[in-house]
Amino acid sequence: MSQPKVSKSSIFAIIAGVIVVLLVCMAGSLFEDADKSKNYVCQMPVTGEYVVWTDGGLKWQGGGNKYEYFKTSQIEFVDLTEVSEGNYVASGTNPAASLTFNDKGKGFIIGSFRVVMPNDDANMKKIQQDFGSEKALIANLIKPTLYKVVTSCGPLMSSLESVSETRTDLIAYITDQLNNGVYKTVVIRDSVTNEITGEKEMRAKAQIVADTNSPSGYKRQETSPFSQYGITCGLVSILDIKYDGATQSQIDAQKQANLAVITSKTKSLEAIQRTVQITEEGRAAAERAKWEQEKEKAVAVTK
């Protein structure tokens, strides 16, 4: 029994059908409708070359693997667990940033900052080659750099200063070091008055080394790793600083001591003002008495 012959048209139809099926299956990797809020790096098949897309619209993907990076994103460091009263541990996927102050107080900064990606091909290709994905970039570069920078800020202030006058400085320090590199510092020892005991004590404090040739006028231990990839950071926000139990107690005691000093000075000033007032009132009374005496003498003479 002879096999039925397959016509050329049938063969072409089968081939065309297979091609159509393949095209349908590959349609998602042939073209990409790029989102303008993202940068894309596409690794082309066979050659392995990178193609970067930084503007939106339909792009030829050619079956390559694409990797997406938001042009700007917010990085949070907010996760903190209180394991016991006044005892905190950084936890979760976005751990809070720890630091130790120059008075040996300890705390965790809870906050966020914004990362802006480069828009040029060279930097995006380098980022893709070195990290391979946005997730890896955040985990292996952005967050470790943040934690290193925050740690370097601790010795620049006391725990009490971080509560009050230098908290805005802390934001500036973090922003500057993220973009320009960690400060070069020297340790100086100053004789200071303990706010609680009133006694003199030696306290070590880190002082930033000035350098007019460096960014912001400060010498750097190293350049920021972000500068190697054209990444910039800004909008640093400190939502809260959680201090461990011992540090919080020390801060509260210092506040009470400062308040007591202010109260004492206020009372002393009030006493001085009262003394001045009494003196002035006495003078006024003496003047009135003298006037009355002169008045009586004048009346007696005219009689």
Q: Model segments located where?
A:
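Generic structural hydrophobic/aromatic packing signal, biased to beta-strands
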Residues: 34, 41, 67-75, 113, ...
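Flexible, solvent-exposed loop/hinge segments and secondary-structure transition points
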Residues: 78-89
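Aromatic-capped interface at the extracytoplasmic side
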Residues: 24-40
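N-terminal Lys/Arg-rich, disordered targeting/topogenic segments
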Residues: 1-10
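Hydrophobic membrane-insertion alpha-helices, especially the h-region
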Residues: 12-29
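Short extracytoplasmic
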Residues: 42-79
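FKBP-type peptidyl-prolyl cis-trans isomerase
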Residues: 37-46, 108-112
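Elongated, amphipathic alpha-helices that form coiled-coils and helical stalk/scaffold elements used
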Residues: 88-303
